[in-house]
């Protein structure tokens, strides 16, 4: 991991003194563009945590931070999601969106989770537009445990986007399969 965001929450649950912690060894292995991506990604977390109390599902947090980091780079989805698409070709599409537990993986497995999350957020932005996804983030962010965030996201998907987790998951699986050139079954 090249960097992470950390800091204490204030009385209202919003971050009051976040900082981006950089590990110089992994950062030194990145290209200039890679370093810019990492700093942008972490800056999204700082901004999110300063303005919204609590947390959203990890797929939304990490997928959106990656989306902002990659926006404007001109990289193709197949390049951005290389590890995730290799996993789809090998194992088929995942049965569910990335979870807190799946983000505890190491190596290429964790990269796949970030990339799967990016594909999901990229798909939602393509379908609904960035303003709606910003609304989704606000409504889906809640104080409490990760399961509370998942329930808040389910409610936000319905109220903000007029869809359900099942519909979003199905569209995401189809998108992964299409990008991987693989059938959408597992």
For the regions a protein language model found, what residue spans apply to each?
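Acidic/His/Gly-enriched intrinsically disordered linker/tail segments
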Residues: 12-17, 34, 38, 52-186
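Active-site scaffold of zinc-dependent metalloenzymes
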Residues: 2-36, 40-50
């Amino acid at each position: 991991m090249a960097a992470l965001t950390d800091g204490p929450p204030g009385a209202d649950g919003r971050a009051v003194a976040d900082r981006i912690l950089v590990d110089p060894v992994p950062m030194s292995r990145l290209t200039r563009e890679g370093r810019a991506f990492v700093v942008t990604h972490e800056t999204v977390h700082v901004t999110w945590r300063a303005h919204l109390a609590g947390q959203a599902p990890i797929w939304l947090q990490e997928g959106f931070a990656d989306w902002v980091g990659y926006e404007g780079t001109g990289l193709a989805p197949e390049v951005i999601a290389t590890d995730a698409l290799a996993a789809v070709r090998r194992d088929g599409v995942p049965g569910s969106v990335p979870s807190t537990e799946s983000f505890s993986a190491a190596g290429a497995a964790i990269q796949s989770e970030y990339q799967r999350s990016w594909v999901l957020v990229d798909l939602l932005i393509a379908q609904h537009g960035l303003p709606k996804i910003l609304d989704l983030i606000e409504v889906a962010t809640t104080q409490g445990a990760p399961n509370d965030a998942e329930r808040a996201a389910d409610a936000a998907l319905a109220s903000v986007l007029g869809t359900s987790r099942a519909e979003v998951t199905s569209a995401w699986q189809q998108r992964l399969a299409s990008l991987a050139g693989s059938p959408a079954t597992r």
